[in-house]
Amino acid sequence: MTDSEKQARIFKVLSVATRVRMIELLKGRSLCVNALARTLKITPAAVSQHLRILRDADIVIADKQGYFVHYRVKEERLAEWNRVARSLLEMKG
């Protein structure tokens, strides 16, 4: 995948405010669907749909803990996204 394709994919995933907020909430800690739903004030079904997109983009990891699945941000992927986005946004000159 070229840098341009990576940039487009990243910005497409981040084009929804709820997903941006989910990434912020999942940095440095893990939360289950119900905790995310309560915090974001959306339904668990909506959270699950957003998490599917974030998992497909390889930005979150699911960890089963007992009956619950907890999600967290993949720090190394977030660092890569930061690098790719910065390469687009940096000023030349």
Language-model-detected regions and their locations in the chain:
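Alpha-helical residues within the helix-turn-helix
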Residues: 38, 49, 55-56
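Residue cluster at the C-terminal edge of the helix-turn-helix DNA-binding motif
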Residues: 55-63
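Intrinsic structural disorder/low-complexity segments
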Residues: 10, 52-53, 73, 86
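Residue-level detector of intrinsically disordered, flexible termini
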Residues: 43-45, 56, 84
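N-terminal helix-turn-helix DNA-binding core of bacterial DNA-binding proteins
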Residues: 5-45, 65-77
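Short alpha-helical linear motifs
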Residues: 48-50, 89
